[in-house]
């Protein structure tokens, strides 16, 4: 009788255990592993691909620890790359252009500042030239997440005044964005997060400044998003040196551009900025003030 009960128990428990094991595997698969577990730890990631986007712009793809890993970077945050270059530790911030939903890899689009191309910076960019010199299989150290802003979805932003302060929550219906050059990467990160959620009705207005038309980073990605989400994403360019047949603005960011292409102050939008410090200090902030956007609703990455 005992043997029969033992056999019966085995017959009953085996399917239950099988189902339990299957559910546990599915649960583990649905919760991807996070690479950036602590902002205080450096993670060595391997270069697995390089794409030439233009004469001075590259897309670098780095492998995460496993095909099941995501980077684990909240929307609005950035990472730091660090490397020993000519005997000195060089650290630079970057915002990935890949989605944090992407498993197994992270993409960075970086403009390479070559030496002897800009008279004010004859040595060029240390980190960007180092990345350009990397071979497939080489590694570099990532650290993060870092930053004072996190987009939590549905128009809600958590913004810390400084690293030691608790975040202040700002909920908006529209977001104004002013980007200059490589400052487009954090904007694209936020725009993608908003557009991929059909229940997020936040409207994004992007004013993107560059020197020439060929300098416009990530233009195909931006225009694809605009075409797919025309009601929620408004895109406008301005160039320092525009071609003759140019449908957008020409010149530095000014009061008129902000009035025409960013949401009005009456909507109480949040205005995000990212670009060269002189652009933020002399073009963005004074003209935003003239239009009527209060400082507490403006944030510079």
Swiss-Prot record:
Where does the UniProt annotation locate this protein? Answer: Endoplasmic reticulum membrane; Mitochondrion outer membrane
Keyword field: Acetylation, Cholesterol biosynthesis, Cholesterol metabolism, Endoplasmic reticulum, FAD, Flavoprotein, Lipid biosynthesis, Lipid metabolism, Lipoprotein, Membrane, Mitochondrion, Mitochondrion outer membrane, Myristate, NAD, Oxidoreductase, Phosphoprotein, Steroid biosynthesis, Steroid metabolism, Sterol biosynthesis, Sterol metabolism
Lipid modification (N-myristoyl glycine), residues? 2
Spell out the reaction equation it catalyses: 2 Fe(III)-[cytochrome b5] + NADH = 2 Fe(II)-[cytochrome b5] + NAD(+) + H(+)
List positions binding FAD.
92-94, 109, 111, 114, 126-128, 185
> Which EC numbers characterise this protein's activity in its record?
1.6.2.2
In what residue span(s) does the FAD-binding FR-type domain sit? 40-152
Which cysteine pairs are joined by S-S bonds? none
Alphabetized GO MF terms: cytochrome-b5 reductase activity, acting on NAD(P)H; FAD binding
* One GO term of the biological process aspect: cholesterol biosynthetic process
Gene3D superfamilies per UniProt:
Nucleotide-binding domain of ferredoxin-NADP reductase (FNR) module (3.40.50.80), Translation factors (2.40.30.10)
Q: Name one GO cellular component term.
A: mitochondrial outer membrane
Which residues are modified to N6-acetyllysine?
Answer: 42, 120
What does it do? Catalyzes the reduction of two molecules of cytochrome b5 using NADH as the electron donor.
Q: Which PANTHER family match?
A: NADH-CYTOCHROME B5 REDUCTASE (PTHR19370), NADH-CYTOCHROME B5 REDUCTASE 3 (PTHR19370:SF121)
Query: Which family is annotated?
Result: Belongs to the flavoprotein pyridine nucleotide cytochrome reductase family.
Q: What is this protein called?
A: NADH-cytochrome b5 reductase 3
- Species this protein is from: Macaca fascicularis
Q: What is the lineage of its organism?
A: Eukaryota, Metazoa, Chordata, Craniata, Vertebrata
């Amino acid at each position: 009788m005992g043997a029969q009960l033992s056999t019966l128990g085995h017959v009953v428990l085996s399917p239950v255990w099988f189902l339990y094991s299957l559910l546990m595997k599915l649960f583990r698969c649905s919760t991807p592993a996070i690479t950036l577990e602590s902002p205080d730890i450096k993670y060595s990631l391997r270069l697995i691909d390089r794409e030439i986007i233009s004469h001075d712009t590259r897309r670098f793809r780095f492998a995460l620890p496993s095909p099941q890993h995501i980077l684990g970077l909240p929307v609005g945050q950035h990472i730091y790359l660090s490397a020993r270059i000519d005997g000195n530790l060089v650290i630079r911030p970057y915002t990935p252009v890949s989605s944090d939903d992407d498993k197994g890899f992270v993409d960075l689009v970086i403009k390479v500042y070559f030496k002897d191309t800009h008279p004010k910076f004859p040595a060029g960019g240390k980190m960007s030239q180092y990345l350009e010199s990397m071979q497939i299989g080489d590694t570099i150290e990532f650290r993060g997440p870092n930053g004072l802003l996190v987009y939590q979805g549905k128009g809600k932003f958590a913004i810390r005044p400084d690293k030691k302060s608790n975040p202040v929550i700002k909920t908006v219906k529209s977001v104004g964005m002013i980007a200059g050059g490589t400052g487009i990467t954090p904007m694209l990160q936020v725009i993608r997060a908003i557009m991929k959620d059909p229940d997020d009705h936040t409207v994004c207005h992007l004013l993107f400044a560059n020197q020439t038309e060929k300098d416009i980073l990530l233009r195909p990605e931006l225009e694809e998003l605009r075409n797919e989400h025309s009601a929620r994403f408004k895109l406008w360019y301005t160039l320092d040196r525009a071609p003759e047949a140019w449908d957008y603005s020409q010149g530095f960011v000014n009061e008129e551009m902000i009035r025409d292409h960013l949401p009005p102050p009456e909507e109480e939008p949040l205005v995000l900025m990212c670009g060269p410090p002189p652009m933020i200090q002399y073009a963005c902030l004074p003209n935003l003030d003239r239009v009527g956007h209060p400082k507490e609703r403006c944030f510079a990455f």
